[in-house]
Amino acid sequence: MRRLLRDLVLTSLASLLTALPACASTPAQRGLIVFQQVCAACHGMDHVDYGDMAAFGLSPDAIRNWAADQQIPNGTDDNGDPKTRPATPADPILSPYPNEAIGRLANHGLLPPDLSRLAMTLHGGPDQIQRILLSYAPTPAGVKLDDGRYYNTALKWKHIGMPPPLQDGMLTYPDGTKATTTQMATDVSAFLNDVAHPHTAERRRIGLYVLTYLALMAILTFLLQRRIWKSRP
């Protein structure tokens, strides 16, 4: 019985420590870094607020600073010209392009898709996102692609309008994880999956509370049982 209680305590505490952002980063947390440093140059997440990134371990100060660096539409001035203001944590993570026309102009006529629900709407979900990111290849002889198209074997039509976004070592993970192309593709796919399914993070938080409760109850039960055993004649 003692061994069972001890194992329960150790297992619960181990799971608890694994779940804490301050102790160890998760693929989704690393994926947020990839989004910030790579994806956000062309893509937005209109259905996600900056403040939602707290679920991925981003501190309130980091959220405010990130948001404040972005300018979002804020009506027009007295001359009818568009105005902007710094974003706040309550604002959505908009596309970096001020309008669709400029977005298309900068990308050979194609508008980079919003990533809020991509892992939900794309056939194959996060696995397909990862495959696309890892399936760029040189264009075969005899195959001609239009300007702004890149050969990619993960797609039925074998081309995509997005240039290869990931390169080994292009960023540094704070937890020391090596930023290989495969690792970054795995991480950002996990992040986009969690973004598309926002209740996943909430379930993890609830699970963290449950694990904490179970660990404390196991310790109290163990101590109470020891006390009962010692009090026996």
State each model region's role:
Residues D7-A19:
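Bacterial N-terminal signal peptides
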Residues A196-L214:
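Juxtamembrane/start-of-transmembrane alpha-helix segments at the extracytoplasmic/lumenal side
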Residues A22-A24:
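Boundary at the C-terminal end of the N-terminal hydrophobic targeting segment
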